[in-house]
Structure formats: C-alpha cells, structure tokens
C-alpha cells in the first residue's frame, strides 16, 4: 500500500471518529450548563 492511501484512510478514520466525539462533548457541555 502507498503512504498516500494509508494517510487518506487515517484521515477518514479520524473524521468518522471525531463525529461522535464532538456530539458527546456538546452533550456534556450542555449537561454541565
């Protein structure tokens, strides 16, 4: 596999994983407020 493909896969994985994390952070902040 090329480094470019690995880089793109890692970026996609981070974006997909960041979605639920952002929602969880927003929910936690709303709960604290």
Curated annotation (Swiss-Prot):
Keywords: Chloroplast, Membrane, Photosynthesis, Photosystem II, Plastid, Thylakoid, Transmembrane, Transmembrane helix. It is found in: Plastid, Chloroplast thylakoid membrane. It is a single-pass membrane protein. InterPro entries: PSII_Ycf12_core-subunit. It comes from the Eukaryota. The chain crosses the membrane at residues 5-25. Its main location: plastid. One of its GO terms (biological process) is photosynthesis. GO terms for cellular component: chloroplast thylakoid membrane; photosystem II. Pfam families: PSII_Ycf12. A core subunit of photosystem II (PSII), probably helps stabilize the reaction center. PSII is composed of 1 copy each of membrane proteins PsbA, PsbB, PsbC, PsbD, PsbE, PsbF, PsbH, PsbI, PsbJ, PsbK, PsbL, PsbM, PsbT, PsbX, PsbY, PsbZ, Psb30/Ycf12, peripheral proteins of the oxygen-evolving complex and a large number of cofactors. It forms dimeric complexes. Belongs to the Psb30/Ycf12 family. This is Photosystem II reaction center protein Psb30. It comes from Anthoceros angustus. The gene is psb30.
């Amino acid at each position: 596999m090329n480094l470019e493909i690995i880089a793109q896969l890692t970026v996609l994985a981070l974006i997909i994983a960041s979605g639920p994390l952002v929602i969880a952070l927003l929910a936690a902040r709303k709960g604290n407020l």
